[in-house]
Amino acid sequence: MLEIFDKLGYKKQKCKTCGHEFYAQVDRDTCGDAPCDEYEFIGNPATDKPYTLYEIQQVFREFLEKEGHTPIKRYPILAKRWRDDVFLVGASIFCFQPWVTSGMVKPPANPLEIEQPSVRLNDVDNVGRTGRHMTCFTMGSHTVINTEENFIYWEDETIRLCHEFFKYIGINTEEICFIKSWWSGGGNEGPCYEVCVRGVELATLVFIQYKTLDNGEKEEIPIKVVDTGYGLERIAWISQGTPTAYDACFAPVVDKLKELTDVKVNTDILARNAQIAGMMDIEDIGDIKELRQQVANSLGITLDELLESAEPMEAIYIIADHTRCLAFMLADGIIPSNVKEGYLARLVLRRTIRFMKELNMKESLAEVMGIQLEFLTKFYPEIKDSEDHIMNIISLEEERYQSTIKKGTSIVKRSIKRLKKEGKTEMPLDMLMDLYDAHGIPPETVVEIAGDNFTVNVPDNFFTLVAGAHEKDTSNKKESFEIDYPETDLLFYKDFNQKEFEAEVLGVVEKDGKNTLVFDKTVFYPEGGGQPSDVGTISVDGAVVNINYAEKVNNVVLHHVDGDVDLDNFVGKKVEGKIDWNRRITLARHHSATHLIVAAARKILGEHIWQAGAQKGVSRSRIDLSHYKRISQEELNEIEKLANEYVMDNIELDIKFYTRDEAESLYGFKLYQGGIVPGKSIRVVKIPGIDVQACAGTHVLRTGDIGPIKINKTERVQDGVERIDFSAGTAAVDSIQNENKLLRESSGIFKVDDDQLPKTCDRFFSEWKAQKNEIDKLKSEIASLKMNSLADDVTEINGLKVVKQLIDADFKELQKIATDFTDNDKADVVLMGNNDGKIVGAASQNAIDAGIKVNEIIKKAAGVLGGGGGGRLTLAQGAGPKCENMNEALNIAIDLI
């Protein structure tokens, strides 16, 4: 037992319900946490006075500042700004992992205090139902980084501060329980105490001592971290005694939503429901209906009475919570999409629309978001700065959602049809999740489309399962490669213009089945940051060897040699190296141009622009930018123009090495536009007044050295990501000349001047379109005539009217004639072919009911033609190169009826 517990009068006890060890000042049978204890503060606040969320944030900050902690500003909730293993900040400690907790970087203050908005979607299905779960919550923390040289405080002082804070806000300390437990998250773990009062956990005090390894094992770390997490929303809630935390923390939003939806509230049922339902999570019960029934039984009312009161309010709570979460997500730079953090934002957004639909709200999501922003921006001015951006995304995403639902009907119907064909009567969960994952079709829409014809069971924790599959980033996992050589001296950082060098060969390293050379120093830039490596030659004892690739492994540059060369003879010798300078300067121009284009795009499109990837090339390069819609040609022109203005300003680049904490302190997380840069020291490329990034690539000395920048095209590479293809320097001149050449050649074909080309092309297209329509009309008339001429060729086979004919018609005509026969009841089965090896089959509903599978018939008939075929039960087509076998193919088709 810790000395501090004894000093403060806490006694070690064991919960008679759950068996957990806990500490309290008075004798108790239970540990103070749900489900062992009900919420005992609803209608009976636990503090001397009520606090709003923002008041409790201020009190928390002031209390810890008096106790010697330095308050710091919140971090973005998008953790990918500084780490590559998770997408979102799930706890305040995520802000300091891995760089601070590993000792590589100094903390911004020590000890520090922060109120950090955090997002957790692993229990999203509990939101609105338990009264306490939120997708986005504010974690108050006092954090300490203890080292051997500077050990500040550990368990005793952490517990004392917690005890004193709750006492300070008016909680009776005899109601506080410290439950002994274990915590892990973000790659670290350690023992902890969960601090509970009147049935709700208010804080977790974690003492991080271990790193969590990939294999699940733990490894002790030299730095000991005090990581506390106070649920500030819950503390505000317990101080007010409202039925739910939502009523306590965003009452103005909840009240406005109640007004818009005209939801009537039975406060007695709602309060008692919150007390009981709060003790149970969906994952604990497994079935929401069972949970509802238990609550209804406890209240002495019917299930219908409970649902009538609870469900509309739960939907309102969910909408209020989700719009708050979205405000932080979008303001901090997340672009909704179908991948990574964008997927999580879209999940929250579409759940919001779903519950608005349940309440039959006439308002748009943008209007509802406006209500949330009016409340939230009073306390977070940085969100106010992003208000227009947020509203643009919300409006666009709402349109996309409606489009998805329309398209979803046919996708779901096809999926159900396939399952029925396989003899299944219920949709598997993995298919239901895939319909949401791949197509954005929510489960309730699938249920609605399936109707009574097919069983679709949606688990109550569906969205929790979906979110859980997307919360961690596994795309950056790399295989480890051990190498035991001293760090290579990178000469290109000391003198960009150095083209030749002399070095000593330290050894030969085999990697990926190839032998590579290690030097003590090099001018060869190794591939990295989307920039290809330098190439060139080395001379050893008069022999010249080509270097076709260089890569860096653990700060050692490996030089790949072209051809089959005995490298062991080189070890210990001096070599003279020379790089391909034209390639180097071209790549450097493209790399510097990349920075200018990103800066220009941010200026033109908005501060949300973030580099999502890049690849530099010799003739053209590309950069991927996170953006919520297509970049228009007008915007592209503006970006290109601004980037070239930066070039003409001929600004000198400022390139320096900083410690990570110095760089972040000076420039923030926008440093990491090009990705997370590992290491304690980082190289910062600054174009004064325009852009600053952590970047290891080669760059020109002044922007004027880049030369012209030509944007070639843009494309949508994935949802939420726009790719800009561009060229710089002489490569840009080549691109411009090539476009001019194509323009002149096109003008020559039409025999018009260049400026007349668009008008001429438009006229030719209009004429072609009109002629095509006329041709299609004539083909339709011909098909009608041919159909009439074939009316007498109907024969009867097994009670079905059948037409078989080899005629002179193209594929589309064959299809039209065949379907016209079956649609107008002139025939049940139509089999037609032409002399080009095309075969078509059509079947009426009467034929299908009789067991005719025209798609299988055509597939077999097309085999005779040396090809294949298939299609639907109503219409199938096939083709093959053996045109001379068409009569045989049609006869085989007839035999299969």
Curated annotation (Swiss-Prot):
PROSITE patterns: AA_TRNA_LIGASE_II_ALA. It is an enzyme of class 6 (ligase). Binds 1 zinc ion per subunit. GO terms for molecular function: alanine-tRNA ligase activity; aminoacyl-tRNA deacylase activity; ATP binding; tRNA binding; zinc ion binding. Its cofactor is Zn(2+). The keyword Protein biosynthesis applies. SUPFAM superfamilies: Class II aaRS and biotin synthetases, Putative anticodon-binding domain of alanyl-tRNA synthetase (AlaRS), ThrRS/AlaRS common domain, Translation proteins. This is Alanine--tRNA ligase. It comes from Methanobrevibacter smithii (strain ATCC 35061 / DSM 861 / OCM 144 / PS). The lineage of its organism: Archaea, Methanobacteriati, Methanobacteriota, Methanomada group, Methanobacteria.
